[in-house]
Amino acid sequence: MNRAAQKRRPFGMKTYNIAALAGDGIGPEVMREAIKVLRAVEKKFAISFSITEAAVGWAGIDAAGKALPDTTLELCKKSDAILFGSVGLPDRDPTIPKEERPERAALLRIRKEFSLFANLRPVQLPKALAHSCPLSLDRQGNGIDILVVRELTGGMYFGQPKKTEDIGNGQQRAIDTMVYTTSEIERIAHVSFRAAQLR
């Protein structure tokens, strides 16, 4: 933040440190717009954001040799929040081992490192767009308002073993393991319960 911006800040205004990881593909475009939103929030409310950008995904591989550079991870640890774009490029992902690809080496690692286990995905249909919905108008009722709560750090993402093996006669067998602990199930259930109480 420059000195002029610091002078304009009201006394006692809270500043939040944000790690902005634009990543690959549409990530940089989405990140530019997200930062514009944060700047608009600063103008409207007594809040300030110190935003530091860092490489992740193929941008990280190109800059530092890995999808989640050490400097990016350290920035995330020192920040109040992480603003994440997207990672992975279909034309480049197949060129490296699965474990080193951006989704696994960057996104899943960040989720695990910071216990980012709950993804809240709202589904809403404004009445102005009702005609675009595949559901007939009589089935839409008063509109659509759904919240999907998705668990991110257990299940098949991190379950082992996970492999494909030859079993002879031109056949292969794929093994993928779904693993959840009691506490992982309880915590995602409680996020869902709390969200339901607010609806």
Language model regions located:
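Short catalytic helix/loop segments, enriched in acidic residues and glycine
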Residues: 35-45
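Alpha-helical scaffold elements adjacent to nucleotide-binding pockets in ATP/GTP-utilizing enzyme cores
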Residues: 33, 37, 106-109
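Anion-binding alpha/beta catalytic cores of soluble intermediary-metabolism enzymes, centered on
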Residues: 13-25, 43, 48-50, 58-199
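Short N-terminal binding/cap micro-motifs at the start of the first secondary-structure element
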Residues: 26-31
